[in-house]
């Protein structure tokens, strides 16, 4: 696949409380801000929030399935968690090619997640080894 600066792909998914609970169970991160509504109501957010890494994992889905696609290998990722994600939020994860290292099969991509109000919740940069396909 020939990649060019500016190429973009995205996915959209609603983060459900069941996703948050499953992520907590898989990772062992049972911070009550994510899984205990009574506790979460006492925090600055006033309700449960999704794990930042759960939301960021949508970026991995875009990279693996769309751009660059199959066989791609994550080499690195920077992330800034800009705003909370709440169960029920619709998140769009978008990646945009910003650099192509010809001959090395490596690309850099801007990574941004936004909510249904078009507010940025995560931003960062990924470095990816492009797959054989």
Regions found by a protein language model. Name each.
Residues 1-5, 85-133:
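HotDog/MaoC-like acyl-thioester-processing domains
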Residues 1-50, 132:
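Catalytic strand-loop segment that frames the active site of acyl-thioester-processing enzymes
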Residues 32, 68, 84, 130-131:
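Proline-rich low-complexity regions
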